[in-house]
């Protein structure tokens, strides 16, 4: 809408014939940020993080000591961005608002808009996970979060297996089981298995019923038999309306 907000544009607010004019009565969407991100204060324009790789195996001693040491890993630069917005309201509209609350509520809408903006940006971890997203983070590895091209800074480490975290299969019992296995077999920068067990399944709202069927069915999943569903209760399901793709899913 044009700014400033004028009495001509909001004529209904000045008309005493209206008994009620509603304003954003929908329940606010849940805040997913604490589930996905750590939150810290900062006094710098950007924050930089790095790590060092694990070391390799200890060889059998044959009379000469073998030396090893870690390598420097990848750097991540977090750039803080400033957001600002305002609302201009015509004095006549403010003075003559017959509802007594709608104009005042417009100021609260700024806060709700800020909250929505934060949630949309937080959802980039999913919506931009298949491309190199540098809006807030710059990673020296230079590949997408979900990629079959992940590398390591440690020389001599094969990335042929355990570095690919990109899948393309539609959500199903078979693909979810395969994703869990692949997750557990992911390797660190030294090429050693991490063996972390995924316990969350993130889906768009389009897949939330299918996700519940996969995780909450006790027996007979996609079968006429009474076979136990080994995925039952294995994960917490998070469905989020901010995830824009209708078919993608993440563990």
Give, region by region, the residue ranges found by the protein language model:
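Generic detector of short, locally flexible boundary/turn motifs and exposed helical patches
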Residues: 10-12, 49-55, 75-77, 161-169
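Charged, low-complexity, helix-prone segments enriched in Lys/Glu/Asp/Gln
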Residues: 19-21, 26, 40-41, 110, ...
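N-terminal alpha-helical "arm" segments
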Residues: 1-27
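Solvent-exposed, flexible loop/coil residues
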Residues: 53, 65, 93, 97-98, ...
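Signature of extracytoplasmic/envelope-associated structural regions
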Residues: 43, 54-59, 77, 109-138, ...
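Long, contiguous amphipathic alpha-helices that act as assembly "spine/axial" helices in icosahedral shell
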Residues: 74-133, 201
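Sequence/fold signature of self-assembling virion shell proteins
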Residues: 2-5, 142-251
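Assembly/oligomerization interface modules of large self-assembling protein complexes
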Residues: 23-83
């Amino acid at each position: 809408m044009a700014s400033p907000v004028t009495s001509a544009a909001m004529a209904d607010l000045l008309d005493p014939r209206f008994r009620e004019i509603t304003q954003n009565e929908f329940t606010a969407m849940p805040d997913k940020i604490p589930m996905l991100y750590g939150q810290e204060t900062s006094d710098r324009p950007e924050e930089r993080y790095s790590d060092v790789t694990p070391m390799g195996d200890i060889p059998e001693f044959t009379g000469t000591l073998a030396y090893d040491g870690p390598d420097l890993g990848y750097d991540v630069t977090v750039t803080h961005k400033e957001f600002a917005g305002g609302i201009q309201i015509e004095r006549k509209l403010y003075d003559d608002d017959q509802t007594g609350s709608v104009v005042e509520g417009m100021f609260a809408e700024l806060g709700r808009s800020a909250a929505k903006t934060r949630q949309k940006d937080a959802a980039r971890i999913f919506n931009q996970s298949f491309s190199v997203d540098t809006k807030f983070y710059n990673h020296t590895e230079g590949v997408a979060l979900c990629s079959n091209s992940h590398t390591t800074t440690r020389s001599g480490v094969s990335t042929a297996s355990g570095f690919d975290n990109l899948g393309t299969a539609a959500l199903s019992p078979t693909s979810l089981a395969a994703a869990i296995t692949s997750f557990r077999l992911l390797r660190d920068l030294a090429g050693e298995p991490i063996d972390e067990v995924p316990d969350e399944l993130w889906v768009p709202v389009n897949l939330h019923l299918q996700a519940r069927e996969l995780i909450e069915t006790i027996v007979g999943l996609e079968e006429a038999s009474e076979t136990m569903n080994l995925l039952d209760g294995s994960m917490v399901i998070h469905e989020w309306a901010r995830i824009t793709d209708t078919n993608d899913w993440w563990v």
